[in-house]
């Protein structure tokens, strides 16, 4: 891979010290990088991923990776999470191992790209959400118990009477 898209959680890398270190390492390998353009809420601006980018490096925790996946929905861009958080279940690469990971991505022996299953949650006719890890359905307002009809691929899986349901 020759070109990387860098997505940084600025709450985890406030002064961009880690981002700079990773970008400098990419340059040392003779490769290119582009820093993600974000709006004031921290979402990646649609249509700003350069066409020559081959991989996104997400610097943050699992939440940062999930947000990047949602923001980049529809892009054919593999993402690799570099964990700057406390728990890196989805952000698989620990910061101390970033050079090894980049070496693998840039080398002759490319790292394998895994396709991950994603869930799409639809509530009623209007609310739609993309999930990488789980979907949480909860009640609104003062309603005590709600009936949840859970469908999978259009087939009723089960009906639950509950305060909420977590689908993972």
Predicted regions: what is each one?
Residues 1-55, 95-112, 123-129:
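ATP/NTP phosphate-donor binding region
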Residues 72:
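Active-site catalytic pocket residues across diverse enzymes, especially alpha/beta-hydrolases
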Residues 76-78:
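Proline-centered loop/turn at the N-terminus of a beta-strand
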Residues 83:
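Divalent-cation-assisted or electrostatically stabilized phosphate/pyrophosphate-binding catalytic cores
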Residues 167-168:
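Conserved mixed alpha/beta catalytic, RNA-binding, or beta-rich assembly cores of soluble enzyme
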């Amino acid at each position: 891979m020759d070109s990387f898209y860098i997505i940084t959680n600025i709450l985890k890398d406030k002064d961009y010290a880690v981002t700079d270190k990773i970008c400098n390492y990419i340059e040392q390998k003779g490769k290119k990088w582009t820093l993600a353009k974000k709006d004031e809420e921290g979402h990646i601006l649609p249509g700003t991923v350069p066409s020559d980018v081959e991989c996104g490096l997400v610097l943050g925790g699992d939440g940062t990776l999930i947000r990047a996946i949602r923001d980049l929905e529809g892009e054919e861009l593999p993402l690799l999470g570099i964990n700057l958080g406390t728990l890196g279940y989805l952000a698989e690469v620990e910061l101390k191992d970033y050079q090894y990971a980049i070496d693998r991505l840039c080398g002759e022996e490319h790292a394998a790209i895994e396709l991950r299953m994603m869930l799409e949650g639809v509530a009623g006719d209007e609310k739609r959400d993309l999930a990488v890890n789980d979907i949480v359905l909860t009640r609104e307002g003062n309603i005590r118990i709600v009936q949840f009809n859970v469908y999978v691929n259009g087939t009723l899986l089960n009906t639950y009477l509950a305060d909420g349901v977590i689908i993972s």
